[in-house]
Amino acid sequence: MEYQYPLDLDWSNEEMVDVIAFFNKIENYYENSVNGQDLMNHYKRFKEIVPSKAEEKQLFKEFEEKSNYNSYKVVQEVKNNPELTSFSAK
């Protein structure tokens, strides 16, 4: 898809790359499938960069407005189903 990722210009280049990598995992969930542990590892790194719940909600909202992909729903599905390894919207 062609859209911009929600980024904070105060982040380092590495942090921006890591946040984009997390959102790429969300895209994979909707477009193909994603490994749950891999997604949670990326989410953990995302939370190191964005520890504020309010900022997380704002970034998730911005991403959903641009992509129609609900990051919160995906993270909750993976968290609530630790026995599964592969996740997909299909």
UniProtKB/Swiss-Prot annotation:
Similarity-based family: Belongs to the UPF0223 family.
InterPro entries: BH2638-like_sf, UPF0223
SUPFAM superfamilies: BH2638-like
Annotated NCBIfam families: PRK04387.1
The protein, known as: UPF0223 protein SH1855
Alphabetical list of Pfam families matching this protein: UPF0223
Highest rank taxon of the organism: Bacteria
Species of the source: Staphylococcus haemolyticus (strain JCSC1435)
